[in-house]
Amino acid sequence: MNRFDDIATWLRSSPGRVRVSGSGSRAHTLPKITDATPLHLSQYNRIERLDAGDQTCTVECGVPRAELDAALAEHELELPCLGGGTIGGLFATDPFGPAAAGCPGPRNLLLGMEALLASGSAFKSGARVFKSVAGFDVHKLFVGSTGRLFVATKLHLRLKPRPRTEQWFANRALERDQALQLIHALRQEAQAEEPPPLDKE
């Protein structure tokens, strides 16, 4: 039996509107709805697959971001976008966009998904690995939709190697051109650093 069959059955029998939630970390950003039935997904929190070689993974919608980050760190990988809460909620709200200039946005990190419509009907879109898929990328519509279109149950994600170092800065007094010059200088400085020597066996 599919772990999400109970949700599909509930959706088929539930009248009216449904409010989907994970950890509830972004509930304050949504408009209040008094006549919606809550659907909590935080218990669906398995990391189903992590392929370090292909730099992809499959997770259930309720996996906490912190737990996924910890699992990826063991393989020197990361999900290069900002935000916490659950993975399903992170992609449904897309609160921050790309983590930095030149990084892929959440839409580009979402390779595919399994999902449920409000009627309880299940469907799949995209793929588990990074490759061309014929047809319309329905799963891309999930990013930023706040769960209005369908419920994502599993997400197939594209990963990236973790950077060797990170450098953050903030300065409200900088003008745009000054900020761009500083970013350019920091990148040149990082590129000039010698990589650590490889261990010889």
Where do the language-model regions lie?
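Single-residue recognition of alpha-helix boundary sites
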Residues: 33, 99-100, 158
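Short glycine-biased active-site loop of nucleotidyltransferases that positions the nucleotide triphosphate
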Residues: 27-33
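C-terminal substrate-binding/cap subdomain adjacent to the FAD-binding core in PCMH-type
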Residues: 92, 110-201
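N-terminal glycine-rich flavin-associated loop
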Residues: 1-20, 40-83, 94-128, 163-171
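Acidic low-complexity segments
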Residues: 85-89
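Conserved nucleotidyltransferase catalytic core and NTase-mimicking acidic/glycine-rich helix/loop elements
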Residues: 37
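Residues that form generic nucleotide/phosphate-binding pockets
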Residues: 10, 71, 90, 182-185
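Major-groove DNA-recognition helix of helix-turn-helix-type DNA-binding domains
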Residues: 24
